[in-house]
């Protein structure tokens, strides 16, 4: 019989972290050399630990902004508050993000596709005009707290993609 030294769910967590690291890497996966495992990118593109953590938390924040409105949310506020505090702390550490609104730190949304490239070209062509400010505001989003669900919604959630979890409405304590 073979014993496992890892907790039961650690494989999924390791896979998620690995995916996030590869997804947030500044170069593509093809830049990794199979012989020594080192990337072939210049030293100016290497991630610092805080930069890597910041990009992972920003990706998670963006992910949470997509899943929370669909009815998936934390039953306790501890995990949400911890993630929000960490993202705000990292935003203060990395002031290169130009998006600030009414004293709140907001994170930029990465623009992709033709529209993002067109907006970037517009800013380069006419940096003195006001559309640059409009583009910056359009590229930012704020962290807002979604109101907690009523007790009835927690105990009897509406039919969704995953269906009700067996632990919904219960307070779980880790060993």
Swiss-Prot record:
Main localization (coarse): endoplasmic reticulum
Signal peptide boundaries: 1-29
Biological process according to GO: in utero embryonic development
GO annotation, cellular component aspect: endoplasmic reticulum; Golgi apparatus; perikaryon; rough endoplasmic reticulum lumen; secretory granule
Keyword Endoplasmic reticulum: yes
Cysteines joined through disulfide linkages: none
InterPro entries: RESP18 (IPR024833), RESP18_dom (IPR029403)
Domain of life of the source: Eukaryota
Cited function: May play an important regulatory role in corticotrophs.
Family per record: Belongs to the RESP18 family.
Protein name: Regulated endocrine-specific protein 18
């Amino acid at each position: 019989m073979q014993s496992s030294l890892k907790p039961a769910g650690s494989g999924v967590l390791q896979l998620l972290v690995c995916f996030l690291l590869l997804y947030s890497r500044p170069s593509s996966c093809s830049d990794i050399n199979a012989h020594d495992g080192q990337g072939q990118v210049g030293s100016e593109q290497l991630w610092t630990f805080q930069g890597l953590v910041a990009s992972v938390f920003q990706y998670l924040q963006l992910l949470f902004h997509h899943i929370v409105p669909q009815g998936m949310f934390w039953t306790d506020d501890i995990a949400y508050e911890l993630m929000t505090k960490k993202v705000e702390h990292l935003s203060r550490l990395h002031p290169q993000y130009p998006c600030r609104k009414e004293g709140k730190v907001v994170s930029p949304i990465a623009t992709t596709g033709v529209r993002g490239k067109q907006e970037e070209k517009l800013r380069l062509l006419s940096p003195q005009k006001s559309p640059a400010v409009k583009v910056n505001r359009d590229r930012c989003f704020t962290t807002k707290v979604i109101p907690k669900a009523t007790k009835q919604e927690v105990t009897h959630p509406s039919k969704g993609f995953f269906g009700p979890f067996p632990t919904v409405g219960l307070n779980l304590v880790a060993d």
